[in-house]
Amino acid sequence: VEKIADRIGGNEAARHALMRGVPEMTLAWQDEVTGVWLRARPDFLPQSCIDGEDIRIVTDLKFLAGTHCSPRKFSKAMDDFGFYLAAAHYSEGIKQIFGKYPTGFVFVVVEKDEPHTVSLYYPPPEDIDRGRKQMRQAIDLFAACLKRNEWPGYADRPMEVGLPIYARMRVDESTETDLTRAIWGEPEEEAA
């Protein structure tokens, strides 16, 4: 833990992103459309959000495997793990509680394993907007489920689910290779 703290503290931008604020403050509010109660718990809420200052940048700390820390891999992780949804949800909670949306959102990404590299990424505003739209749909669906007391699963009726394309290709290729070997034997190596 000390090594990770040292790595974060050694990164000037990360250090500033985690200064002057409140860690893990719980925000709770009632959705204006559905009346459903919502909550969020940002990793770090800057004092500037609480005080209503002009610059309000929220920080979300992510500890990830190194395979998710490069810009390209983090882009995929934003989708896989819904980080853009969290940014949208936290932003909405901050607006509801403090009256203004954050002016920015930054992910401080730390590799779980040594050397514990630290990277800072921010989602473009249009991705946070996408997250807001999805959150709106999710809240509306949740409210409808509450009202009806019906909680549908992924497939309430029989549904065909097949192998993904990559698995089909792998199986088909290995089956063809195995069949060829069974009929013709191992291929002979060409003479040099």
Language-model region placement:
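Metal-dependent nuclease catalytic cores that hydrolyze phosphodiester bonds in DNA/RNA
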Residues: 1-41, 155-156
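Conserved beta-strand scaffold positions in the cores of enzyme catalytic domains, especially
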Residues: 23, 58, 105-107
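A generic structural motif
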Residues: 28-32, 45-49, 108-110
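Short, solvent-exposed loop/turn segments at secondary-structure junctions
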Residues: 28-30, 64-66, 112-114
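Short secondary-structure capping micro-motifs at structural edges
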Residues: 30-33, 41-42, 74-78, 91-95
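Short, solvent-exposed loop/turn segments that connect beta-strands within catalytic domains
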Residues: 32-35, 50-55, 98-101
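Conserved catalytic cores of phosphodiester-cleaving nucleases, focusing on short active-site segments
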Residues: 40-74
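Metal-dependent nuclease catalytic regions and adjoining charged, substrate-binding loops involved
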Residues: 77-84, 89-192
